Amino acid sequence: DTPSATYKKELLFKLMQAFADKNADYFVADPEVVEKALAEAPTDLDHYTPESLVAFTAAKKALEGVGAETTRAEAKELISSLKAAQEALVYTESYAKEVAEKEAAEKLAKSKVISIDAGRKYFSLDQLKRIVDKASELGYSDLHLLVGNDGMRFVLDDMTLEANGKTYASDDVKAALLEGTKAYYDDPNGQALTQAEMDELIAYATSKGIGLIPAVNSPGHMDAILVAMQKLGIEHPQATFDTVSKTTMDLTNEEAVNFTKALIGKYMDYFKGKSKIFNYGTDEYANDATNAQGWYYLKWYELYGKFADYANSLAAMAREKGLQPMAFNDGIYYNGDTSYGTFDKDIIVSYWTGGWNGYDVASSKLLSELGHQILNTNDAWYYVLGRD
């Protein structure tokens, strides 16, 4: 009732639009709205299954038929039908795999990971929770937790293992692993996390938006497991070169290899469905028995191919259990040489070292060109080994 007020067409048009929308049964469909809905529909339909395209094609055709006699209400219903059919589209199996791999690669590329070596040194559940708290606060994405690295500091409720045509009783395996861990380092703060504690840690990390990447290292960094195998009756599981290794398994000892695969498989079974990635190590082969020349020794003795087969078998095992396989970089195409063996391209390479004097590793560029995803964990920048 104020004729002196300034006329604003935007306000009038908005009111006209609202009235038309409110009385959609009496107004003709808005062609711009229809065109927008059609433009948002996918056009490359080769990625979808024929079955799921039936409803989508019919809904799109119906919307394309909107004309001067179609009301807004009818058009709105047709648009809703098209959107529902679009949401119900199903990728073909091959394209779904391609999308999943792309998403996993993007997630890995954006990962911000804190790595805790809870194999060498015991970390309590409370300590690990506090680390998770800080990781969440700072915006980290994952906790990489080495539970088997020199020591073995995570024990499942049931450690029964089937290998070498025999059954290794749960209590015997637990006792042997505990003895091996104490032989490596008898930590006064504790020895190993229980399954209940790991369950709680994973649930807690999930609640804080932190994923968990478990690691059980082999065939190197196996000090505790090597002692355990001997206690369980497996003779001479250690690799022997200049001296007998305290850390590394002999890849020609089938009894030791079978036991180790059964043990790692046990942990993979536990972590499947709880973690996306499983790191099985494979770094620093027999460095203590070769003056850090273990990879050269494997090549000299024509055993490098056996190492590649071992690494690939663990990758296949992880994949079968729904886990992405991860391994450290130094043993993979050592010295950039691809002539001694081929590694599974599904192995995510945790690139922890660029090498040192006489320890010559493949470049990250080569590994990427050979099809591997790379997680940058360069120890020269990030690695701190606590001495106390």
Regions found by a protein language model. Name each.
Residues 101-119:
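N-terminal small/glycine-rich loop or linker at the start of catalytic domains
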Residues 112-116, 143-145, 212-216, 278-280, ...:
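Hydrophobic faces of well-ordered beta-strands that scaffold small-molecule active sites
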Residues 106-110, 150-207, 222-258, 286-302:
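Aromatic- and acidic-residue-enriched carbohydrate-binding clefts of CAZyme catalytic domains
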Residues 250-348, 352-372:
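Active-site neighborhood of glycoside hydrolase catalytic domains
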Residues 127-151, 271:
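Catalytic domains of carbohydrate-active enzymes, especially glycoside hydrolases
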Residues 1-102:
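Beta-rich interaction/scaffold domains
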Residues 138-140, 197-219, 245-279:
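An active-site-proximal structural segment forming one wall of the substrate-binding cleft
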Residues 121-135, 360-363:
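Short, acidic/polar
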